[in-house]
Amino acid sequence: MRQSLKVMVLSTVALLFMANPAAASEEKKEYLIVVEPEEVSAQSVEESYDVDVIHEFEEIPVIHAELTKKELKKLKKDPNVKAIEKNAEVTISQTVPWGISFINTQQAHNRGIFGNGARVAVLDTGIASHPDLRIAGGASFISSEPSYHDNNGHGTHVAGTIAALNNSIGVLGVAPSADLYAVKVLDRNGSGSLASVAQGIEWAINNNMHIINMSLGSTSGSSTLELAVNRANNAGILLVGAAGNTGRQGVNYPARYSGVMAVAAVDQNGQRASFSTYGPEIEISAPGVNVNSTYTGNRYVSLSGTSMATPHVAGVAALVKSRYPSYTNNQIRQRINQTATYLGSPSLYGNGLVHAGRATQ
């Protein structure tokens, strides 16, 4: 219920993305309207304020709509509107990806644990068809790109780290037997919005995903996004997110939320990557430098970034879910944290380097 489609009431975020207006006074921008549950519906908002509703969330009390400055001003005065925020841009956490053996994945594989039965939603630029990947399904929340096919490469790269097939070609993913779902929330340029990400989370909830990988981020917080994250957590989904690539303190959203495992990146020596954002929200670390994985055009490329570290953790989460099917999202999270290898300062490395072998014992 956070961003775009179906929800109820008013509140949250302003558009972030484009908007070529006609008359300045009539220019419309996208906002996320957070409302009082049961008090306001998209229909009542349309009728009372004559606004263009794009989406009403089902799981959270948020309406995604286009508003003029005059409409925005009126809505802010509505006592049933808790917040209104711009539908801010969300971008890829990437620089320019090795780490399967580094996190001791082979120990899990040697025990016959490959991720069978775990469902992982990759919220990204989509996933391209590739001989080293098996896509179980998906959806697109980019209006100009109705297919979940990846036209960028980032999502395909992330997907390969999670679950590239054990088929003797290309690369091997952390959980090669996990079910991958391509949820496109970023366009061909690697840009999306708070609304598209919230819709992707909502899709994951409605389609019973176990794990959500979010190798993306925004520097600004969002009531809508936080609502969606909390709803997914309550639905039993483990969310994993990229900390960011600024090299400075200040973890990106949604990774900064307590409902998301914030992932930092380390190099081949187990040292924090120079670009890896740090702060008290960091929960776990994983390989994120020169990571080789699947890419568009049936290719393989090496990329670096916390975007590349995050799917290592999502993959280990899939292995744990496969090893312990009855585990809740919180139990999986606790297992990963308790079995990590200590690396140093928690603000840099969190609980340490994720360890697939110990996590699946």
From Swiss-Prot:
Cofactor(s) needed by this chain: Ca(2+)
EC number: 3.4.21.-
Main location: secreted
Cofactor note: Binds 2 calcium ions per subunit.
GO BP term (any one): proteolysis
Stretch forming the signal peptide: 1-24
Pfam families in the record: Inhibitor_I9, Peptidase_S8
InterPro entries tied to this protein: Peptidase_S8/S53_dom, Peptidase_S8/S53_dom_sf, Peptidase_S8_Asp-AS, Peptidase_S8_His-AS, Peptidase_S8_Ser-AS, Peptidase_S8_subtilisin-like, Peptidase_S8_subtilisin-rel, S8pro/Inhibitor_I9
PROSITE patterns, A to Z: SUBTILASE (PS51892), SUBTILASE_ASP (PS00136), SUBTILASE_HIS (PS00137), SUBTILASE_SER (PS00138)
Cellular component GO terms, alphabetical: extracellular region
Binding site for Ca(2+) 1: 94, 132, 165, 167, 169, 171
Enzyme active site: 124 (charge relay system), 154 (charge relay system), 307 (charge relay system)
Record domain Peptidase S8: where: 97-360
Propeptide: 25-93
Activity across pH: Optimum pH is 12-13.
CDD domains per record: Peptidases_S8_Subtilisin_subset
Listed result of changing residue 86 to E: In strain: AH-101
Keyword Iron-sulfur: no
Biological function: Shows keratinolytic activity.
Protein name: Thermostable alkaline protease
